[in-house]
Amino acid sequence: MKGFQLIATGGALPGRTVTNEELSRTVDTSDAWITSRTRARHWCTEEESAATLAIAAAKQALQRSGLAPADIACCVCATLSAPDATPSVACQVQAALGLPENRPALDVNAACSGFLYGT
């Protein structure tokens, strides 16, 4: 593999939207303070995890790219929120998308800089 190309992106949000009112009841703050800084936030439901969200986003990116699963040379997932130590999120994405098993799949655990390290 010689470098990489970012051809398409995908995205996924957790199913539970946490309102500012709901959050202000659990911490000592106000809706106005939260809105000025973060607006809405989304939390995973019991059925969701970093892996399920990564799979949904990767499926969307693959569809948008026009590539076949066999065209993908490597699967890299950057997360600090893996639901399990093993299998890695990348291996779960690889399996769910039908990517070739003889290609690398790895997680990058580098917090906020994960995207930079992963690319």
Question: Where are the regions a protein language model picked out?
Answer:
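Conserved "HGTGT" condensation-loop signature of ketosynthase/thiolase-family condensing enzymes
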Residues: 1-74, 94-97
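Conserved catalytic cysteine-centered active-site region
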Residues: 33-37, 41-52, 79-119
